[in-house]
Amino acid sequence: MEMLYGIMPEISLLLSALIFQLIGAYSNNTLTHVIAKMAIGFAAILIAILVFHPSWFNGIYWNNTFIVNQSKIYLKIIILIFYIFLTLIYSGYIKVANLKGHSEYIVLMQLGALGGLILVSANDFMVMYLGIEMQGIIGYILTTFNYNNSRSSEAGLKYFILGTVFSAIMLFGISLVYGTTQSIRYDIALHALQNPSSDMAVLVAAILMILVGVLFKLSIAPFHMWTPDIYDGAPLVVVALFSSLPKISVLALLGNLLSELKFASDAFFYIKTIIMVLACLSLIVGAFGALLQQSIQRFIAYSAILNLGYAVLALVANSSNVIRAEISYFYIIIYAASMLGFIAIIINNFTNRANYLKISHLSGLSNVKKLSSILIAIQMFSLVGIPPFAGFISKYIIFTSILKSGMYELIIMGIAAVVIGSYCYLNIVKVMYFLPATVRFQNSSVNFELSLVSIASTIIVISLMIICMLFGEGLNVIV
């Protein structure tokens, strides 16, 4: 029985998802709002238990294949908080759009959160594959959720084909790892790189295959090709999901893998260099790609590529065999909060037109929706990295860490990406405040759920900066 304690949050999420699905099926989706409230309440209880009783779950389970410690509990709490935000966004969306709603959407999101929790604690390649595939399959389904729209169906098919190809590459890599090391545990398989053997080339190739699958999920160039089309075709509420839960959990997975790889110093140096180059390529692709976009959803896609480039760079951009995971996680949390707040405001103000909206449609928004415009401006300023918002401190930490490592060429590239990205984000502020309106805005009532997400995300990007300023010593430790 003690072996089940470590996965009680995961078991609880799975069982509650099954209960919510049964309620939705027998009520013919008439209780979607009730199910949403139940899901939020359940996640809040789970967060409270993890916060106040973390010792209940700490431990190493099933022969070191599943690990729960304090840092992993923090990540699980963050994933559950973003799951609550996503449920609020969907609940608010079906209210403002006057839709019946589908309880299975909430269930699928909850299973996506479950996959994220599994990825955070996985110390075994098959457990990792289970978590990634759980999130992947849910992503395929949700992309096509607007099944009456051809763009949504096309995006879902593209995502499914590309996702299965990269999943197969990852699975082939896992099989080669087992064939060469007789183990699929991270610590045993990856530490085998310390001992030169005739199978070394095969093992390195296998690890690179696994990392290719992980970088695909993170939209790191050149494995980003799916991101703009899928974001553009999926409903905006699904884009909100793609911008948060999978990115946080898969980044945590990459941090776990690199933390074990660092013990094989020679192989780790080359693998780290490859990832660093790809992260820099993501900065270029994301910055210039966002520069050319008119569609808000494609803009969000290239923004994801750009910001994941920074997050991955934060993991590996140092001169020693050290993984700065806390810097990377801090950055991606701020990015995800800013993007969810932005998406919630768009849905709240444009309702049925929120999907496939263009940046030009935001022109003149400040004349009609002053508070919404202020909140969007704050999110954009944070994404640019303008003080006093948290986006500034996250970029400052990354650049300071790189500077201490003496990698000045990365500093130059990072600053160039910031400058180009600044134009993209500030262009939205310019459109809202300085261009005349091109569409008629609806004088709809303010939705509570969407407003709560937009305000909460704004509080996050402001309060994290204040916390860092008040606790300067803690900040110095991170840097």
Curated annotation (Swiss-Prot):
Source species, domain of life: Bacteria
Pfam families associated with the record: Proton_antipo_M
GO MF annotations in UniProt: NADH dehydrogenase (ubiquinone) activity; NADH:ubiquinone reductase (non-electrogenic) activity; quinone binding
Enzyme Commission designation: 7.1.1.-
Cellular localisation: Cell inner membrane
Stretches that traverse the bilayer: 3-23, 40-60, 77-97, 102-122, 125-145, 159-179, 200-220, 234-254, 268-288, 299-319, 327-347, 373-393, 409-429, 452-472
InterPro entries: NADH-Q_OxRdtase_suN/2, ND/Mrp_TM
UniProt record, GO biological process: ATP synthesis coupled electron transport
Keyword terms: Cell inner membrane, Cell membrane, Membrane, NAD, Quinone, Translocase, Transmembrane, Transmembrane helix, Transport, Ubiquinone
Membrane topology recorded in Swiss-Prot or TrEMBL: Multi-pass membrane protein
Catalytic activity: a quinone + NADH + 5 H(+)(in) = a quinol + NAD(+) + 4 H(+)(out)
GO CC annotations on file: plasma membrane
Family recorded in the similarity comment: Belongs to the complex I subunit 2 family.
NCBIfam families (UniProt xref): NDH_I_N (TIGR01770)
Oligomeric and partner information: NDH-1 is composed of 14 different subunits. Subunits NuoA, H, J, K, L, M, N constitute the membrane sector of the complex.
Protein task: NDH-1 shuttles electrons from NADH, via FMN and iron-sulfur (Fe-S) centers, to quinones in the respiratory chain. The immediate electron acceptor for the enzyme in this species is believed to be ubiquinone. Couples the redox reaction to proton translocation (for every two electrons transferred, four hydrogen ions are translocated across the cytoplasmic membrane), and thus conserves the redox energy in a proton gradient.
Name of the protein in question: NADH-quinone oxidoreductase subunit N
Organism per entry: Orientia tsutsugamushi (strain Ikeda)
